[in-house]
Amino acid sequence: MGIWKKLTLLLLLLLLVGLGQPPWPAAMALALRWFLGDPTCLVLLGLALLGRPWISSWMPHWLSLVGAALTLFLLPLQPPPGLRWLHKDVAFTFKMLFYGLKFRRRLNKHPPETFVDALERQALAWPDRVALVCTGSEGSSITNSQLDARSCQAAWVLKAKLKDAVIQNTRDAAAILVLPSKTISALSVFLGLAKLGCPVAWINPHSRGMPLLHSVRSSGASVLIVDPDLQENLEEVLPKLLAENIHCFYLGHSSPTPGVEALGASLDAAPSDPVPASLRATIKWKSPAIFIFTSGTTGLPKPAILSHERVIQVSNVLSFCGCRADDVVYDVLPLYHTIGLVLGFLGCLQVGATCVLAPKFSASRFWAECRQHGVTVILYVGEILRYLCNVPEQPEDKIHTVRLAMGNGLRANVWKNFQQRFGPIRIWEFYGSTEGNVGLMNYVGHCGAVGRTSCILRMLTPFELVQFDIETAEPLRDKQGFCIPVEPGKPGLLLTKVRKNQPFLGYRGSQAESNRKLVANVRRVGDLYFNTGDVLTLDQEGFFYFQDRLGDTFRWKGENVSTGEVECVLSSLDFLEEVNVYGVPVPGCEGKVGMAAVKLAPGKTFDGQKLYQHVRSWLPAYATPHFIRIQDSLEITNTYKLVKSRLVREGFDVGIIADPLYILDNKAQTFRSLMPDVYQAVCEGTWNL
């Protein structure tokens, strides 16, 4: 709606006021337009309400009705883009406000209600309900009352052995380093430490040497509890840990290492008397509860702070998305991951559901274990659902009880294939980061979107999508020094506003790293935003689409290239099973040229001509990958995300890469084998890229 039409409506409202008529019908029409995505109507609505005639009839006059009719008549001939989602927007907003009120009631309790209280509540209400099932070699389960009793035993043992050292200083933490095979024991100790008010850092069990030492130090841990199977990892750094007065324990019944005590026998013999809440009475909502390590720009992990408030918020997402007490949740993600620990295990504690923990993800065993345990909710990240779709089809693919899938990183093509093959499973895709202060949620199930917003939600969780410099990874600014918003549908760097009720807690012991994630003066002087480091787009309908991590996006021929977009295009080819796109530097060229590491589908061969025709049809020239690397398998992280850093370092050097390499040949209209002479021509600048 143009500015002149808006001014006409404003004059109409003022005319109604002057005639002593109630302007409510026209004002409500303006409010409807604003809700559907016309924010300038909010200003007009406010002006109209200021002129409301206090002494007038409450019954609308015919003139007011005409004003309302004219307002609605000025809507576009085609409904606004967000109109069809209006009922879901309203329902989600009310649900969000309802959960917010419940959350505030818990916030106002002294001491605040934490996940430990949720465990004790479930143990009293449903003592014999199975809380946790561990698959794999452990193959055990534990009820609510048993889990609460084991955690009480752990609390009493650690309190006695440490002589209150942990709880006397709330800055101290405990660190847990375990393999997935020790899940029940580790979680019992974790909950026991929480009963003492002690924050816990979960460390990746693959950490060794300096990264392990750095993780323990940066978390501020005074206690390290280690899986006996990780003896070698511990002994490499034990002298330095002991020199720093860090108490080390094995989560087993014997200790082969001098200076390290075994906890197993003491845990078995300890009393299971309830731990008084007074031992954790000093904690606040903002107190650290858990440290989750995230990768840093320096290569060393950083301990992101999850406060008790943040833990309750994230763990309640399970309930928010429809998980019930009679559900069984299948969690294949590691406990040192936010989704695996907080959303999965602690989320089940909040709602009273059973959590089935697998030691690791297995595409071949996934559905068999779901059927065996009666799973109704599954959690995913990254490539998990794509791996399930890549398994050969089976007659029993749709024979299961799964009704909900929750997670992030699901591509649109995999979304469709997953639901077509395994049935109408409701997918809750969301976006967020461990240290982030705001998350997004695709609450309407719109394929490919990571979240949705509306005019009201944008007020509740303010954000900005802004232009950025791909080389410096910093937001671009205008002449006044403010960030420059992007147009709808254009990729932009996501910034989320830091407010009192949406704080950024940062990383423990690293104020410089924390400050590096903040951006000031984004829209006005004095405001503060969290830099997610992620590139997203927001379409006209209000849906967010993930484009790339800022570090993965690269620039070629003066254009920004989204690796995620190129991966989606290449993945649609039938002879490619897995695709990982990245940018590599070329001598004498500015920016990076596109390259893709691929895994061929079973029984398929590489077709250079078909690939050439496909990328030329679906990708702009600057986004077309010029090099292809065929691998037997693509390397992934522990959270099932593709690894790009090593591939970028190796580039397309035929001297160090044993995998088959191909290069785009525009003259032959194909991808041909990259031979040493062609490689030399590329490096010398005589091959036209």
Curated annotation (Swiss-Prot):
Underlying gene: Slc27a5
Any GO MF annotation of the entry: cholate-CoA ligase activity
Any Gene Ontology CC annotation: basal plasma membrane
Protein name: Long-chain fatty acid transport protein 5
Location of the protein in the cell: Endoplasmic reticulum membrane; Microsome; Cell membrane
Family: Belongs to the ATP-dependent AMP-binding enzyme family.
Residue numbers binding AMP: 292-303
Membrane topology per record: Multi-pass membrane protein
Organs and tissues of expression: Liver-specific (at protein level). In liver expressed in a periportal distribution.
Cytoplasmic side: 1-29, 76-689
Lineage start: Eukaryota, Metazoa, Chordata, Craniata, Vertebrata
GO term, biological process aspect, one: ketone body biosynthetic process
Observed effect of gene inactivation: Mice exhibit a severe bile acid conjugation defect. Display a significant reduction in both liver lipid uptake and content and show a redistribution of lipids away from the liver to other tissues. Hepatocytes show significantly reduced long-chain fatty acids (LCFA) uptake.
Catalytic activity: a fatty acid(in) = a fatty acid(out); cholate + ATP + CoA = choloyl-CoA + AMP + diphosphate; (25R)-3alpha,7alpha,12alpha-trihydroxy-5beta-cholestan-26-oate + ATP + CoA = (25R)-3alpha,7alpha,12alpha-trihydroxy-5beta-cholestan-26-oyl-CoA + AMP + diphosphate; chenodeoxycholate + ATP + CoA = chenodeoxycholoyl-CoA + AMP + diphosphate
Described purpose of this protein according to its UniProt entry: Mediates the import of long-chain fatty acids (LCFA) by facilitating their transport across cell membranes. Also catalyzes the ATP-dependent formation of fatty acyl-CoA using LCFA and very-long-chain fatty acids (VLCFA) as substrates. Mainly functions as a bile acyl-CoA synthetase catalyzing the activation of bile acids via ATP-dependent formation of bile acid CoA thioesters which is necessary for their subsequent conjugation with glycine or taurine.
InterPro entries linked: AMP-bd_C, AMP-bd_C_sf, AMP-binding_CS, AMP-dep_synth/lig_dom, ANL_N_sf
Gene3D superfamilies registered for this protein in UniProt: 3.30.300.30, N-terminal domain of ligase-like
